[in-house]
Amino acid sequence: MNKLIKAEFYRSMRSGIFLPIYALMSLFTIYMTFLTYRDSSLVDGDGYELFAFLASYSEGGVMVLGEVIGIIISLMIGKLYSDRFHYYEIMDGANTHHIILSKLIVYNIYSLVIVVVPAAVSYTAVAVNYGTGGIEKPWLPILLLTIIIMNATSLVLLLSMIIRRAIIGAVISYCYAMIIIMLYMFYDAEITGVSNKFTGFLFDTSPYIQITKLGYDYTSAEYIAMVAGSFVVTVSLLYTLTYISHRRKNFR
């Protein structure tokens, strides 16, 4: 397992595409959190700065950043299958569970470093400088952000491992996010609510929509349950489907 994780890190870092884009996205996230921090520091009010930062960050392009990460992961995973690299892993004695888990661990670490770490640092800086403003459990938004990002990353990664085609996986990932976002904007769910229960369920369980509500609903028990529940159900279901699809291809 450790060898597979190290090999996955090495492969991704050796990629001529992944590392430059990873560096650019890291810089973009740091820049975005800096702008959000600067805007929140201009807010007048007793402790409102932390809430302003949280609300601005959750609406300030994190959703788009998550989708970019998804497309890159789809392309990276698809390339591994097009190069038939997974057969070498099997020949080296790796089993299906270890192959899937190693990729989940590596790419979730990348996503957390790109998205969550800069947000956590800036969030902490605002809290230290201006106080928490009476926000209960100030650590909770960062924990929820971590779960949401892991949900989005795992969803794209496991779908890509099932599809095994770089372009198709990236297109499906992009279309899913765009359709959900466009439907959400059409229904204007934050203001008017959603009358269609199925559409409302899609919004509540989609990480791309959950992240836009982070700055406002992080204290809601229903929101917390949806974030945690959708993560567990999505990863469990897609992990099972990924394992079955690999076993059918005579994997161990």
Regions found by a protein language model. Name each.
Residues 1-25, 251:
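Aromatic- and glycine-rich beta-strand/loop motifs that create alpha-glucan
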Residues 18-21, 89, 99, 168-170:
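Alpha-helical transmembrane segments and their helix-entry boundary regions
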Residues 24-76, 101-184, 189, 210-231:
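Secretory targeting signals
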Residues 11, 78, 89-91, 156, ...:
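Helix-capping/transition residues at the boundaries of transmembrane alpha-helices
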Residues 232-252:
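Junction motif at the cytosolic side of a transmembrane helix
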Residues 75-109:
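Helix-loop-helix units of permease transmembrane domains in multi-pass membrane transporters
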Residues 191-215:
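Short hydrophobic, aromatic-rich alpha-helical segments embedded in or entering the lipid bilayer
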Residues 15-16, 94-95, 164-166:
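Short loop-to-helix capping motifs
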